[in-house]
């Protein structure tokens, strides 16, 4: 926290975009203490440093998994959100905003490059369950949401992008297979190219 405060003071920081986190659910589930340390304590250090150095705005990048969390990663992000809300009540000089993201296409750790690679290698494409569905947003949409939250945020408001319809991952994989000039191989098409 002291090093962070020194950086904030040296560069007279006006706005912090706090995106550092352990965000991959399986990784956090198998490393609970490290995930909690990164997502909760890391956020707490940033919040305290921002307050101590009188930073005007702090935008916290959270997750859609913080809504009624069903895993450690989501719970740690929700706990971090609550920390911001508690500190805001006692420290009116720093504006806190919370941005909840779904899955950002082509971001680090996105499943899209993994699926693309599996298709290019001839499959199979790994899918945990046929009914899995997710919301997706583009990098420009995510960036716009973060910037708007920084400009508009007051009182630890939570900003969520309307991400439209939920997308079944299986349907998305089938479209990716077709776009690659291949055909799905399943019980209905044994002569196809790529299995899921």
PLM features per residue range, with description:
Residues 12, 18, 22-81, 86, ...:
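Conserved Rossmann-fold NAD(P)-dependent oxidoreductase catalytic core, especially the SDR/UDP-sugar
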């Amino acid at each position: 926290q002291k090093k962070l405060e020194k950086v904030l003071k040296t560069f007279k920081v006006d706005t912090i975009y706090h995106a550092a986190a352990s965000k991959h659910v399986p990784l956090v589930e198998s490393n609970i203490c490290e995930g909690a340390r990164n997502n909760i304590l890391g956020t707490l250090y940033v919040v305290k440093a921002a307050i101590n150095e009188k930073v005007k705005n702090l935008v916290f990048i959270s997750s859609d998994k913080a809504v009624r969390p069903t895993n450690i990663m989501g719970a740690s992000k929700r706990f971090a959100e609550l920390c911001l809300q508690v500190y805001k009540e006692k420290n009116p000089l720093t504006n806190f905003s919370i941005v909840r993201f779904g899955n950002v296409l082509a971001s680090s750790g996105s499943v899209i490059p993994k699926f693309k690679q599996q298709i290019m290698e001839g499959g199979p494409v790994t899918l945990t369950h046929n009914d899995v569905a997710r919301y997706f947003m583009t990098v420009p949409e995510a960036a716009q949401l973060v910037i708007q939250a920084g400009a508009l945020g007051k009182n630890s408001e939570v900003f969520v992008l309307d991400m439209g319809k939920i997308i079944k991952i299986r349907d998305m994989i089938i479209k990716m297979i077709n776009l690659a000039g291949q055909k799905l191989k399943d019980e209905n098409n044994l002569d196809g190219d790529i299995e899921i």
